[in-house]
Protein backbone atom coordinates (compact mmCIF):
# COMPACT_ATOMS: atom_id res chain seq x y z
CA UNK A 1 0.00 0.00 0.00
CA UNK A 2 1.31 3.41 -0.90
CA UNK A 3 -1.47 5.75 0.16
CA UNK A 4 -4.98 6.15 1.45
CA UNK A 5 -7.68 4.39 -0.59
CA UNK A 6 -10.07 6.84 -2.29
CA UNK A 7 -12.90 6.09 0.16
CA UNK A 8 -10.66 6.87 3.16
CA UNK A 9 -9.16 9.92 1.47
CA UNK A 10 -12.70 11.21 0.89
CA UNK A 11 -13.50 10.73 4.61
CA UNK A 12 -10.39 12.68 5.60
CA UNK A 13 -11.11 15.59 3.23
CA UNK A 14 -14.80 15.69 4.20
CA UNK A 15 -13.81 15.89 7.88
CA UNK A 16 -11.51 18.83 7.03
CA UNK A 17 -14.38 20.83 5.47
CA UNK A 18 -12.07 22.64 3.01
CA UNK A 19 -9.65 23.84 5.71
CA UNK A 20 -6.19 22.54 6.56
CA UNK A 21 -6.55 20.44 9.70
CA UNK A 22 -3.35 21.91 11.15
CA UNK A 23 -3.64 25.67 10.63
CA UNK A 24 -7.38 25.93 9.94
CA UNK A 25 -6.88 28.56 7.25
CA UNK A 26 -5.36 27.21 4.05
CA UNK A 27 -7.09 24.80 1.71
CA UNK A 28 -5.90 21.21 2.21
CA UNK A 29 -3.93 19.80 -0.70
CA UNK A 30 -2.75 16.43 0.55
CA UNK A 31 -3.62 13.57 2.88
CA UNK A 32 -0.79 13.29 5.41
CA UNK A 33 -0.04 10.03 7.26
CA UNK A 34 0.29 10.85 10.98
CA UNK A 35 2.16 7.60 11.54
CA UNK A 36 4.59 7.51 8.64
CA UNK A 37 4.50 4.59 6.23
CA UNK A 38 8.28 4.19 6.42
CA UNK A 39 10.04 1.72 8.71
CA UNK A 40 7.45 -1.00 8.13
CA UNK A 41 4.42 1.13 8.95
CA UNK A 42 2.75 0.37 5.63
CA UNK A 43 2.30 -3.28 6.67
CA UNK A 44 0.11 -2.34 9.63
CA UNK A 45 -3.62 -2.54 8.87
CA UNK A 46 -4.38 0.83 10.50
CA UNK A 47 -1.83 2.77 8.41
CA UNK A 48 -4.37 3.74 5.75
CA UNK A 49 -7.36 4.37 8.01
CA UNK A 50 -8.88 7.83 8.54
CA UNK A 51 -7.58 8.13 12.12
CA UNK A 52 -4.06 8.11 10.69
CA UNK A 53 -4.75 10.87 8.18
CA UNK A 54 -4.89 14.65 8.18
CA UNK A 55 -5.94 16.83 5.24
CA UNK A 56 -3.28 19.53 5.22
CA UNK A 57 -1.85 22.33 3.11
CA UNK A 58 1.51 22.09 1.41
CA UNK A 59 2.96 24.71 3.76
CA UNK A 60 1.80 22.84 6.86
CA UNK A 61 3.13 19.55 5.47
CA UNK A 62 6.52 21.18 4.99
CA UNK A 63 6.36 22.47 8.58
CA UNK A 64 5.51 18.98 9.90
CA UNK A 65 8.50 17.50 8.09
CA UNK A 66 10.91 20.22 9.22
CA UNK A 67 9.72 20.51 12.84
CA UNK A 68 9.19 16.88 13.74
CA UNK A 69 9.50 17.27 17.53
CA UNK A 70 6.67 19.81 17.49
CA UNK A 71 4.68 17.58 15.14
CA UNK A 72 4.92 14.62 17.54
CA UNK A 73 3.99 16.85 20.49
CA UNK A 74 0.86 18.04 18.70
CA UNK A 75 -0.18 14.65 17.32
CA UNK A 76 0.47 15.55 13.68
CA UNK A 77 2.98 12.70 13.70
CA UNK A 78 2.52 9.44 15.62
CA UNK A 79 5.31 7.05 16.57
CA UNK A 80 5.35 3.58 14.98
CA UNK A 81 4.38 1.73 18.16
CA UNK A 82 1.19 3.75 18.73
CA UNK A 83 -2.35 3.57 17.39
CA UNK A 84 -3.28 6.90 15.74
CA UNK A 85 -6.91 6.56 16.92
CA UNK A 86 -5.64 6.77 20.52
CA UNK A 87 -3.31 9.77 20.08
CA UNK A 88 -4.91 13.24 20.41
CA UNK A 89 -4.18 15.74 17.67
CA UNK A 90 -4.19 19.55 17.82
CA UNK A 91 -6.56 20.54 15.04
CA UNK A 92 -7.00 24.03 13.56
CA UNK A 93 -4.45 25.34 16.03
CA UNK A 94 -6.82 25.25 18.99
CA UNK A 95 -8.86 22.04 19.34
CA UNK A 96 -7.50 18.80 20.82
CA UNK A 97 -9.40 15.87 19.34
CA UNK A 98 -9.24 12.15 18.74
CA UNK A 99 -9.81 11.06 15.14
CA UNK A 100 -11.77 7.92 14.32
CA UNK A 101 -11.84 5.73 11.25
CA UNK A 102 -15.27 6.99 10.12
CA UNK A 103 -14.16 10.59 9.55
CA UNK A 104 -15.33 11.92 12.92
CA UNK A 105 -13.63 13.76 15.77
CA UNK A 106 -14.12 13.54 19.53
CA UNK A 107 -13.04 16.49 21.70
CA UNK A 108 -10.43 15.70 24.35
CA UNK A 109 -10.31 17.13 27.84
CA UNK A 110 -7.14 18.12 29.69
CA UNK A 111 -6.36 14.60 30.96
CA UNK A 112 -6.73 13.00 27.51
CA UNK A 113 -3.82 15.02 26.16
CA UNK A 114 -1.05 13.23 28.02
CA UNK A 115 2.02 12.40 25.95
CA UNK A 116 2.28 8.81 24.74
Identify what each model region corresponds to.
Residues 25-28, 50-74:
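Short Cys/His-centered divalent metal-binding micro-motifs
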Residues 36-37, 65:
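Alpha-helical and His/Cys-centered functional microenvironments
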